[in-house]
């Protein structure tokens, strides 16, 4: 799949990021490689193959769930948001 300027602009809009002009060509190339890799994975025939690894069997170790309240974390996260108010992200309305 070819990543063109139109698709990159749409991805920028959806992700609410702006790719610098000097990095657009390299980003398009990298995204193209990722899409090609996924297309290769999609073309593999895996019907009838037994899974060789899964975490569904309960082998993942449990950890204690300890509540924490660090008041700096929301500020650190929201400082990267284009818009925020009262510890919430403000995003454009996409569903009518």
Curated annotation (Swiss-Prot):
The keyword RNA-binding does not apply. It catalyses: L-glutamyl-tRNA(Gln) + L-glutamine + ATP + H2O = L-glutaminyl-tRNA(Gln) + L-glutamate + ADP + phosphate + H(+); L-aspartyl-tRNA(Asn) + L-glutamine + ATP + H2O = L-asparaginyl-tRNA(Asn) + L-glutamate + ADP + phosphate + 2 H(+). Transmembrane segments: none annotated. The keyword ATP-binding applies. Allows the formation of correctly charged Asn-tRNA(Asn) or Gln-tRNA(Gln) through the transamidation of misacylated Asp-tRNA(Asn) or Glu-tRNA(Gln) in organisms which lack either or both of asparaginyl-tRNA or glutaminyl-tRNA synthetases. The reaction takes place in the presence of glutamine and ATP through an activated phospho-Asp-tRNA(Asn) or phospho-Glu-tRNA(Gln). Its EC number is 6.3.5.-. Keywords: ATP-binding, Ligase, Nucleotide-binding, Protein biosynthesis. This is Aspartyl/glutamyl-tRNA(Asn/Gln) amidotransferase subunit C. It comes from Wolinella succinogenes (strain ATCC 29543 / DSM 1740 / CCUG 13145 / JCM 31913 / LMG 7466 / NCTC 11488 / FDC 602W) (Vibrio succinogenes). GO terms for molecular function: asparaginyl-tRNA synthase (glutamine-hydrolyzing) activity; ATP binding; glutaminyl-tRNA synthase (glutamine-hydrolyzing) activity. It holds the Pfam family GatC. Heterotrimer of A, B and C subunits. One of its GO terms (biological process) is glutaminyl-tRNAGln biosynthesis via transamidation. Belongs to the GatC family. InterPro entries: Asp/Glu-ADT_sf_sub_c (IPR036113), GatC (IPR003837). The gene is gatC. It comes from the Bacteria.
């Amino acid at each position: 799949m070819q990543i063109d300027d139109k698709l990159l602009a749409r991805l920028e809009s959806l992700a609410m990021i702006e790719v610098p002009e000097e990095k657009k060509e390299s980003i398009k190339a990298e995204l193209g490689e990722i899409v090609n890799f996924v297309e290769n994975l999609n073309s593999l025939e895996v019907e009838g193959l037994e899974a060789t690894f899964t975490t569904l069997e309960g082998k993942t170790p449990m950890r204690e769930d300890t509540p924490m309240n660090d008041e700096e974390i929301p500020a650190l996260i929201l400082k990267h948001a284009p818009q925020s108010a009262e510890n919430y992200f403000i995003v454009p309305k996409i569903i009518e």
